[in-house]
Amino acid sequence: MKLQQLRYIVEVVNHNLNVSSTAEGLYTSQPGISKQVRMLEDELGIQIFSRSGKHLTQVTPAGQEIIRIAREVLSKVDAIKSVAGEHTWPDKGSLYIATTHTQARYALPNVIKGFIERYPRVSLHMHQGSPTQIADAVSKGNADFAIATEALHLYEDLVMLPCYHWNRAIVVTPDHPLAGKKAITIEELAQYPLVTYTFGFTGRSELDTAFNRAGLTPRIVFTATDADVIKTYVRLGLGVGVIASMAVDPVADPDLVRVDAHDIFSHSTTKIGFRRSTFLRSYMYDFIQRFAPHLTRDVVDAAVALRSNEEIEVMFKDIKLPEK
């Protein structure tokens, strides 16, 4: 049994059982992957994949267990490499972050700028996607950190640490009836067509919860994953925008009026997460603390030592988080 064989079967699953696509991603040949998979199956005396002709159709029940263990083994191999790197080149390496557009565009720029200035030999890569894609990227080892607000049930296998609270703002054009108000009620908001986030992105579930709590149905006419896109359609008069308050920039958005929405919506909490098997390099601890100053190395280590995210929630329940 070879590590290469374990890597092949994991990557085949990551590529939805498409061996051709797997070969392209690994810069190798399709026959080479198929041969190594067969050799592993022959050695184990069991099928990892069911087949129809030359095509893989599904992972067998035994294969699912083997894939799970293979992921753990490969994760440990990565951890060994990280330990070695920490001792030989502590300021050199890579960092892969999976997050949403709102975090990438509004919460992370200054953090990343300072981080790159401090660690010029660390290559930083960002993957933007939906909460499902973010969770998938980290759980499969394609990203080191997940930074997210929504769909936290997708992150049960990760250590999730609370970073900051944030709320929403209502944005309208200067000639809109709501533009002259300092605050509005949810009943007033329900009278207008809304332009907001796609469900599952950037606190959208809290918007739906607030309307359900009030016994109202929001009239959502347009959704997008990108706050900048939402603001564009607000400018076109399509509706009232409901976006993260951090996404409203007085300098970049002088043609929009912001109305506070703290009285309508409860705050949301953005968290940063990583696999329990991840060996955190010194620069990774530093990135976490730059993003969330209360998450010092000692605090992170104490949280990792806990058995579940429920225990982590209890650990942080009396800590006042920053607000954005």
Swiss-Prot record:
Gene Ontology cellular component terms for the protein in this record = cytosol
Provide this UniProt record's keywords sorted from A to Z. Answer: Activator, Amino-acid biosynthesis, Cysteine biosynthesis, Cytoplasm, DNA-binding, Transcription, Transcription regulation
Compartments, as annotated in UniProt? Cytoplasm
* Pfam family of the protein (one): HTH_1
HTH lysR-type domain location is 1-59
Q: What is its main location?
A: cytoplasm
Which organism's genome codes for this protein? Escherichia coli (strain K12)
Q: What does this protein do?
A: This protein is a positive regulator of gene expression for the cysteine regulon, a system of 10 or more loci involved in the biosynthesis of L-cysteine from inorganic sulfate. The inducer for CysB is N-acetylserine. CysB inhibits its own transcription.
Q: How does it assemble?
A: Homotetramer.
Task: Name the family the entry cites.
Answer: Belongs to the LysR transcriptional regulatory family.
What's an example Gene Ontology biological process for this entry?
regulation of DNA-templated transcription
* Recorded name of the encoding gene: cysB
Q: Name one GO molecular function term.
A: transcription cis-regulatory region binding
Q: What is this protein called in UniProt?
A: HTH-type transcriptional regulator CysB
* Chain residues forming the annotated DNA-binding region: 19-38
